């Protein structure tokens, strides 16, 4: 693990430890975030900690053409129970995601600093959101970083206040991204939920080829 000063670049991701932890910084900025995503690195830390940067191996990814839609989701997709929008309520989505704990982690990792910097990237059209509505209520959503020049979407977090709402939003987003020519969706780390949607683990070196 390396401590990186604000003026320094990240070390090679091959220097990450066995858990994927690569570096620690005191700074978080839009420029630092963009450097990270283009190198296959993402931030994940708790409030009160320094910024921890990760590049796990293997890497959980979804190839859009491999999306799995369970039979139980068909009624949701064929009816009007939920409606989906894109980039309409980014701030509300990241706020709601901040109230959801990540698996195996106490507290939220979406700190005020995270919200501030991702909102700046949203204003630049780089951080994007998907909103799921039930009538006028925001019941689910997700956000991430869209590297359009690489045809890669980096998912960050999702939330759900109604059964299957976040899954509905994820499916709709993947379908949209596939139409736009996206080759890969970065899901970061393994979860059984993501696996059920068609995501798989690949070697980090294979993942990085999509960012070259």
From Swiss-Prot:
Gene3D superfamilies to which the protein is assigned, alphabetical: Leucyl/phenylalanyl-tRNA-protein transferase, C-terminal domain (3.40.630.70), Leucyl/phenylalanyl-tRNA-protein transferase, N-terminal domain (3.30.70.3550)
Keywords: Acyltransferase, Cytoplasm, Transferase
Enzyme class: transferase
Compartments it resides in: Cytoplasm
Enzyme Commission number(s): 2.3.2.6
InterPro entries (UniProt xref): Acyl_CoA_acyltransferase, Leu/Phe-tRNA_Trfase, Leu/Phe-tRNA_Trfase_C, Leu/Phe-tRNA_Trfase_N
One BP term from GO: protein catabolic process
Pfam families reported in the protein's UniProt record: Leu_Phe_trans (PF03588)
GO CC aspect terms: cytoplasm
Protein name from the UniProt record: Leucyl/phenylalanyl-tRNA--protein transferase
Organism of provenance: Christiangramia forsetii (strain DSM 17595 / CGMCC 1.15422 / KT0803) (Gramella forsetii)
The gene coding this protein: aat
């Amino acid at each position: 693990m390396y401590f990186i000063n604000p003026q320094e670049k990240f070390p090679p991701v091959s220097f990450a430890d066995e858990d994927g932890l690569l570096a620690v910084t005191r700074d978080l900025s839009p420029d630092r975030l963009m450097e990270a995503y283009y190198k296959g690195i993402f931030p994940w830390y708790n409030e009160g900690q320094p910024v921890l940067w990760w590049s796990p191996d293997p890497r959980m990814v979804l190839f859009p053409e491999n999306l799995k839609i369970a039979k139980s989701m068909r009624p949701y997709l064929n009816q009007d129970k939920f409606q989906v929008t894109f980039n309409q309520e980014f701030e509300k989505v990241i706020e709601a995601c901040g109230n959801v704990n990540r698996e195996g982690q106490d507290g939220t990792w979406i700190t005020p600093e995270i919200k501030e910097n991702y909102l700046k990237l949203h204003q630049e059209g780089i951080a994007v959101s998907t909103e799921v509505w039930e009538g006028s209520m925001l019941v689910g959503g997700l956000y991430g970083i869209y590297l359009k020049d690489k045809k890669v979407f980096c998912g960050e977090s999702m939330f759900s206040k109604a059964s299957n709402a976040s899954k509905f939003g994820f499916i709709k987003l993947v379908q949209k991204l596939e139409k736009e020519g996206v080759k890969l969706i970065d899901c970061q780390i393994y979860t059984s939920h993501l696996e059920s949607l068609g995501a798989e683990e690949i070697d980090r070196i294979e993942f990085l080829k999509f960012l070259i």
